Structures are given as C-alpha cells and as structure tokens.
UniProtKB/Swiss-Prot annotation:
Noted pH dependence of activity: Optimum pH is 8.5.
Gene responsible for this protein: gci
Catalytic reaction list: D-glucaro-1,4-lactone = 5-dehydro-4-deoxy-D-glucarate + H(+); D-galactaro-1,4-lactone = 5-dehydro-4-deoxy-D-glucarate + H(+)
Enzyme class: isomerase
Transmembrane segments: none
Disulphide-bonded residues: none
Protein name: D-galactarolactone cycloisomerase
Length: 378
C-alpha cells in the first residue's frame, strides 16, 4: 500500500455580516481540506487549522516526502515530516499542515483495517458527546450586549447545556455582555468566556475577579500564547479556571505550558496540534499534570469528525463510577460549507452529537460542495 497523490481543497465563503474576535476580523470563512490517495484507491481526508492558502502550500511542500510511502506507518511519517521543517518552525504552519496530513493518514489506516479511528486509538468509551455552543462574536452594526444575549438564549432553546462567548473588547463592556448573557440563559446553563488573547495580565485578572460571580466554567486564552508566565499569573490572580492550548501546537509547546502551570484546562486542536499521532502524546502529558483536556474545534465537518473520534477514545481521568465526561466545542457561527462537505452532516441534536462508528473518520465527503465552495484563485 503506497501513497500516490496528495491534494488540497481550498474552500471559502464571504460573509454578508463580518464579525470579530478580540484578535482578528473575519469577512469570510476559509478552510483547507487535505486529500491523500493510495495505489489501491483508498482515500483519506484531513483538515488544517488556520490560514487556508498558506497551509495548502506547506502541505504541498511536504508531499515529496509522502509519495511512495506506506500510509499505515503514521508514527514514522509524522517524525520524518516534523524533522523536515524542524529547523524552521516547531509550531505554526509546519504543525498545522502536518496535522491535516496526519488526520488523512489515520483515515486511510482505519479504512484499510475496517475500523474507526477511535478503535485504533484503543477503544470507544462513549458513543456520543454533549456539545457546547461557540458564538457571540462581535458583529458589525449591531448592539453587542443584546446580540450576544439573544444568540445564547437561542442556543439554550436548541438544547445546548453550555455556551462560550467572546470577550477581550474591554473589561467594562465585556462585563455587561457576560451579565446580559447570564440573565438570558438562566442560572443552570454552563457559561465559558474566551478572550482570544486580547487582554493584558492586569485586565485579565480584573475581569476574572469581577466575572466570577456569574458562574463561569473557564476563562479561555486570557493573554497572548507566548507569555506562559503571564498565563500562570492570571491563573493565580483570579478565581476562574484558565483554559488555553489551541495555539501552542505539538507536544513540546504543550509540555512547556503545562510545566509553567499555565492552565487548568488544555485545549489542543486536532487540526493544529499534530493530528491523531500527536494528540495522544499531549493527552498523556495532560494526565501527568492533572490537567483536563477539552479539544478546540473550529472548522468543517472533517474536523468535527476527527474531534469526535478522539473524544470517543478519551480515557476518563480518573476512571470512576461517575466519570467526568468530555464536552465538545460546536461552532454555531455562519459557515454554509461546514456540514455541506459531508454527505451525512454531524449535527448536535438537543446539544448531543453522535460519534460515527464507520471505518476511519466514519464520514463520506460531498465532492459537489468542494466545487461549490472552491476558493477563487488569487
């Protein structure tokens, strides 16, 4: 069994209403899928976190090391590709591109052996997961406080048990949003906040102290990811558990953050941290440090499927009669090709997502959607 082709599919949809996080503005949704084909006709799919066109370029740069290789040798291939660009970058695009490749290889491996990736990872602990809704970005020409409150009330009505809102736009305004959302969703729905590294240490500590009374499950990315000491200071300086990890990439970045005592909750993104081969190592590191894992998810149905396979195989920590079950991030911002790329969408029904049990990722790609949402040439 040999790899014969590596392809990327650039997807894009321009938004009618742009929106912002604390760190960047979105006027479109853009993602890249990775397709790897083998000499026996088996095809695997993956996805990369981050800017689509640069990721595609790095995937193609890696392809020379992939053609002719046995796709089942995922650990060997991962090490070779990582080493190929090691001197130029141990994080960033070299890892996000490698993630999409690794996911596709595991999809192939699962199809070859007739088993879901979760089974190849060691077995399924669960057949479904509860999801929390992500949204509440700052939209143009609307009142942010009322817009966020009404949006999260809708998510409650859809059956979600938890939601995450965007902050980082200023302490006083953010507190008004948090208060309005809590009032709109009631006292029982879990609420998380995500600053997208938009605060200084002082601002984050002030916000955390004043927001804690609203019953916040975690405070995500309070400061920029390079400042691990700042993370630790925020964690020590206010009462809300601190979360982060989508931008640290790979076991080495996660190890440094965990060693610094930066977070209570680690959020690796399968499409950015190195894929299935790497997230298993990251999960072990988190367990050794007594830190809970809640994967970050921001992409198409391919990423949703990958996250579900990993979460099916996540061992409870600790194993007990009533274990702490993982929860899945479920992006509810506008993205018409998120589910369209799949022949059978992976939707949250009453806030619960069923985990596919077919071979590999357990999904089939809708190639018509790849054509419909193809990114225009530059």
């Amino acid at each position: 069994m040999k790899i014969t082709a590596v392809r990327t599919h650039l997807l894009e949809h321009r938004l009618d209403t742009p929106f912002e996080s604390a760190s960047m503005r979105f006027d479109r949704r853009a993602h890249v899928l990775v397709e790897i084909e083998c000499d026996d006709g088996t095809v695997g799919w993956g996805e990369c976190l981050g800017p689509a066109r640069p990721n595609a370029a790095v995937v193609q740069a890696y392809s020379g090391w992939l053609i002719g290789q046995d796709p089942r040798q995922t650990e060997k291939i991962w090490a070779v590709l990582y080493n190929a660009l090691r001197d130029q970058g141990q994080r960033g695009l070299s890892l996000t591109a490698l993630s999409g490749i690794d996911i596709a290889l595991w999809d192939i491996k699962g199809k070859h052996y007739g088993a879901s990736i979760s089974m190849l990872l060691g077995g399924r602990w669960r057949e479904s997961v509860r999801a929390y809704a992500t949204g509440s970005f700052k939209r143009d020409n609307v009142d942010r406080v009322s817009d966020n409150a009404s949006e999260m009330a809708e998510r409650r009505a859809e059956g979600f048990h938890a939601c995450k809102i965007k902050i980082g736009f200023g302490v006083e305004e953010d507190l008004r949003v948090i208060a309005a959302v809590r009032e709109a969703i009631g006292p029982d729905m879990r609420l998380m906040i995500d600053a997208n590294h938009g605060y200084t240490v002082t601002e984050a500590i002030t916000l955390g102290d004043r927001a804690a009374g609203f019953g916040i499950d975690w405070f995500e990315e309070p400061v920029v990811p390079e400042q691990l000491d700042a993370y630790a200071r925020v964690r020590a300086g206010q009462p809300i558990p601190v979360a982060g990890g989508e931008t640290w990439h790979g076991r080495y970045g996660m190890w440094q953050a965990l060693s610094a005592g930066a977070v209570d909750i680690l959020q690796p993104d399968l499409c950015g941290c190195g894929g299935f081969s790497e997230i298993q190592k990251i999960a072990t590191l988190a367990t050794l440090h007594g830190v809970r894992i809640v994967p970050h998810v921001w992409g198409t149905g391919v990423q949703i499927a990958a996250a579900l396979q990993f979460m099916a195989a996540m061992t409870p920590d600790p194993v007990r009669v009533n274990p702490i079950e993982p929860i899945m991030e479920f992006d509810r911002t506008h993205n018409p090709f998120r589910q369209a790329v799949l022949r059978e969408p992976l939707e949250a029904v009453n806030g619960v997502v069923t985990i596919p049990d077919g071979p590999g990722l357990g999904i089939e790609i809708n190639r018509d959607a790849l054509t419909e949402f193809r990114m225009p040439d530059p």
